[in-house]
């Protein structure tokens, strides 16, 4: 069981208690902590849509500390980030690996950050298949299609060619925050809060 802190605020009508994530959401801050899966993606997508409905002209701050996870779950967040009007400020705290790195790079250009000791890792998609040989072939083709899609998007986000992305993601490719700036995954290393 994970522990979720609560904060208490004084209002004109007394005290109000929030879990920390609800309180952060009030300030347009969304947290991705842990593995990317359908349940996490649904929660993040709902928060993005809620914040756009509240104010489509204000930035949304998306903090990422994730080892990655399910590609299609990550793509649902990516598509929503691009679908809504507000700029998405991405900030890596801890690590952004695999789909976490993809989401980090998918923030609004000029507003993609990492803290000084954050680690970013990119690599090719992985997956497994079982069943009849034709089913395995279908799954392999789907993984290849997803790989090509991710490489094209990462190329656009980093300014690299899709061929270069394919080469650089052949194996796990770890970077410091500074190296991620040089690679084009993020725009700046943050040393002080800007909110």
From Swiss-Prot:
It comes from the Bacteria. Pfam families: CLP_protease. The active site is at 98 (nucleophile), 123. It is found in: Cytoplasm. InterPro entries: ClpP (IPR001907), ClpP/crotonase-like_dom_sf (IPR029045), ClpP/TepA (IPR023562), ClpP_His_AS (IPR033135), ClpP_Ser_AS (IPR018215). Its EC number is 3.4.21.92. GO terms for biological process: protein quality control for misfolded or incompletely synthesized proteins. GO terms for molecular function: ATP-dependent peptidase activity; ATPase binding; serine-type endopeptidase activity. Its main location: cytoplasm. Keywords: Cytoplasm, Hydrolase, Protease, Serine protease. Fourteen ClpP subunits assemble into 2 heptameric rings which stack back to back to give a disk-like structure with a central cavity, resembling the structure of eukaryotic proteasomes. This is ATP-dependent Clp protease proteolytic subunit.
